[in-house]
Amino acid sequence: MAKVYYEKDVTVNVLKEKKVAIIGYGSQGHAHAQNLRDNGFDVVVGLRKGKSWDKAKEDGFSVYTVAEAAKQADVVMILLPDELQPEVYEAEIAPNLQAGNSLVFAHGFNVHFDQVKPPANVDVFLVAPKGPGHLVRRTFSEGGAVPALFAVYQDATGVATEKALSYADGIGATRAGVLETTFKEETETDLFGEQAVLCGGVTALVKAGFETLVDAGYQPELAYFECLHELKLIVDLMYEGGLENMRYSVSDTAQWGDFVSGPRVVTEDTKKAMGTVLAEIQDGTFARGWIAEHKAGRPNFHATNEKENEHEIEVVGRKLREMMPFVQPRVKVGMK
């Protein structure tokens, strides 16, 4: 079982007198910066010119280029998309790191897969809230918190663990609990969850269910409701209280169908395929493929995305959602 740390375990905040540079001001960046500031930390924001720069300024932060922010900071938290981090790190952060600084991440991908190679004289750790930035900020403002993970990759100063817990405490995570892990474990489990269950697994299951009903002659609109739209109702029940809560809340007919049919859909062969997915994450196959795809301009990524967006379930869904003005996407579709 994971070791969990709480507020009582952070007796001395070793970062309170240090300057923290938050690199990036998106979902996580704005939450980290504002929570740290509210907890008395000296925070600056490092960005390239654009809308985020203006937003951080409006929120009252001193905003600098990434290089300028990194140069003056003791702690540099990189909250940029994974694929952008190596270039920004090499060009603007690495030349400005000093011995004893802390290089911090919210996901271990680039360090674990050697895309970012920190110098030996800095501490390297991650603090990863298990929720989106808006929730990290809102719960903090309400006196609560989102749990987080932390891991130490490199302890150059001898107090990297204390620094990581101090940072986690600064964003409020110790109110809920901070679980200790490693860069390897955080990275591999995160990627596996996305690919086998949360994104890849769910989308493949939803499409297969939709196609099965449509191919059998049922109306696409009903197939959409049964296989996609109602998924939120079930996921919310699981989110709130696990599988037990979901099964308690649905009808007995639905629960019995769960018991007798679920294992016939997700079979031992499915688990073997999941094992293959995990192995390709562990040995770096997935990472190498994604890095190469990004460097090539993402031709397959964009082609697949365009094709998927025209699947019948998407065409039907767009029409049905026009009937439901209460359903509004949090992020405008097509922004990527």
From Swiss-Prot:
Residues 182-327 form the KARI C-terminal knotted domain. The keyword Magnesium applies. Pathway: Amino-acid biosynthesis; L-isoleucine biosynthesis; L-isoleucine from 2-oxobutanoate: step 2/4; Amino-acid biosynthesis; L-valine biosynthesis; L-valine from pyruvate: step 2/4. Mg(2+) 2 binds at residues 190, 226, 230. GO terms for cellular component: cytosol. Mg(2+) 1 binds at residues 190, 194. The keyword Cell membrane does not apply. HAMAP family: IlvC (MF_00435). This is Ketol-acid reductoisomerase (NADP(+)) 1. The gene is ilvC1.
